């Protein structure tokens, strides 16, 4: 999904902007950095319970924590990493609002991606490092230093 498709999916959900944060690939997609296959959200417990009661399919994450799924959207109470945790309150307070949607900040997203170690996360870390260097005004270099 490109940024417009992700935004359309999120707008259709009509979630309270102060109760969730877009994380993962969808946060990159909305910023126009790459496409994504799904939309991961971290939400406050009251919204999680409301969506669960509304019939969202329950799932269990690799760390044993509960999640919800409907279509392309997956809902969590936290991120799937113990070593780089952030509370939902912290995520909401530090979210970057784009197109009316709260996105995880790039530094936090990069920290999570570094802990996962999957091939797609390694590619995302390289992308995020370039974007953050550019944002800081530093010269852009490839991962091999050129």
Model regions and ranges:
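Compositionally biased terminal segments of proteins
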Residues: 1-146
């Amino acid at each position: 999904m490109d940024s417009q498709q992700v935004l359309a999916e999120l707008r259709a959900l009509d979630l309270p902007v102060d109760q969730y944060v877009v994380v993962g690939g969808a946060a990159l997609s909305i910023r126009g950095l790459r496409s994504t296959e799904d939309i991961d959200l971290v939400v406050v417990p009251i919204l999680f319970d409301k969506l669960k009661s509304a019939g969202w399919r329950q799932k269990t994450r690799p760390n044993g924590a509960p999640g919800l799924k409907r279509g392309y959207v997956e809902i969590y109470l936290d991120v799937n990493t113990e070593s780089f945790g952030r509370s939902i309150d912290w995520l909401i307070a530090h979210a970057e609002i784009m197109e009316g949607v709260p996105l995880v900040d790039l530094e936090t997203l990069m920290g999570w991606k570094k802990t996962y170690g999957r091939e797609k996360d390694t590619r995302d870390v390289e992308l995020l490092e370039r974007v953050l260097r550019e944002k800081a005004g530093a010269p852009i270099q490839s991962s091999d230093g050129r």
